[in-house]
Amino acid sequence: MEDQYEKKITWTIKNFSFVQSQAIDSDIFVVGDSKWHLVAYPKGNGESTNKCLSLYLNVADFQSLPNGWKRHIKYRLTVVNQMSEKLSEQEVIQGWFYKNFHISGFQTMLPLSKLLDKNGGFLVNGDVKIVVEVGVLEVVGKSDVLEETLLVHESIDINGFQVLPSQVESVNNLFEKHPDIVSEFRSKNPLMRTTYLNDLLCLTEILCESSEELSTGDMANAYSTLTCLKKAGFKLDWLEKKLKEVCEARVQEIDEEWKDLTDLKENWSSDDEDDLNRL
């Protein structure tokens, strides 16, 4: 079920064929009250070495987790076929993560012969795209990760949200411009409220950037974050409109770039023909 996934992240591994490390990590992301990241073995792991891409979901900073911590997680891993989404390789798993069992995934996510096929659609312009969707089904024990973050800095309460001093101006502006933004938001968990608000602040900051600086992966993550926030009860019609405008502007820029390349190609072809006629 789609609503079981709270967060969707796209991870693009650049120059995949030239990666020398045995294992590589994605950026850290927050789901629920805990930090996570993906771990990929480009040349495979264990019995799958030199045979398959191995891919795992791992709890970041698991050493700092308190005893008794465990999370029931459902997640979906997808190696994206960039030529046809229908051909993407996908695996779904559901289970418990513990302090001492903090990593889970697939040793045989995708055969390397299929992944590295130049015409296969998984490796395009040297890049491999991986999508992870994660949902928290059950929580046992507290996570100190976000609590420690809040304790390190003095926090200020704004409309029931714990806000860092550096965020006060942005949050106040947000509530002044959109006073009904949290009128239907019902979560009482302070850590969850902080997580959602941080996601919202990041999203508004991203959409203030030039559309030229946003990749298709950035826009896909933005849409995913927006969807999660709306499901949680945030009223974000204004932000959805802004995101559509940014995406449309980016599409227009890509079209113009493509037209410039096409014109350049035609000019080259014309110059080559003139050179031949002179011979």
UniProtKB/Swiss-Prot annotation:
Keywords associated with the record: Coiled coil
Transferase in keyword set: no
Residue ranges the record marks as coiled coil: 235-271
Domain MATH: 6-134
Keyword Coiled coil (UniProt): yes
Cited PANTHER family: TRAF-LIKE FAMILY PROTEIN-RELATED, TRAF-LIKE SUPERFAMILY PROTEIN
Annotated protein name in UniProt: MATH domain and coiled-coil domain-containing protein At1g31390
